[in-house]
């Protein structure tokens, strides 16, 4: 019986190949749910249980998320804005509500910081800056990039935590000059900016943990590549299998 089974062709051979290609193409960043969505986008008719079973049998396991957040809050040093966003993470129009934050990496013995700005409508990263110091100029630069790229209409909103960069007059002035509204999370409440925290979790799992970067320049290039991939290729379940740019 077992000899006969071994001689029979594998009825899932083509599906296994498609699964492996999806997994490899996306640099081991996809678990079975996103592989399933990718396959369905290609025209495969298959259920999640089979994809899960085959990926386990093939030893294909996505990278595991690790969390160790950078904390920019150092107390109330200036102005604390109201939590105007109030966890309304699903605006009905593009270029109306943005979120931002800072996260920290260790690269070639140095601390490196990333400041992205996300449009909550499609969860795309519309601007980002990388620096070796989490300064006010560094965070303001990413917001200035976002304003230039998106040209939001008066009344747009930017939400952050209570980090010192966002209490600073330079950040507040930039918002008011472009007729925006500042919103801040409540003290110590990461869930008020959960979408950006979630992005950081995916980014660190999918392009940072387990990788080695010899220089900050090499790391910067990897960040640029990841954000391009995230915006144009990475499938999102909340977007029903589409990418932010689709």
Language model features with spans:
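Charged DNA-binding/catalytic regions of mobile-element recombinases
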Residues: 1-246
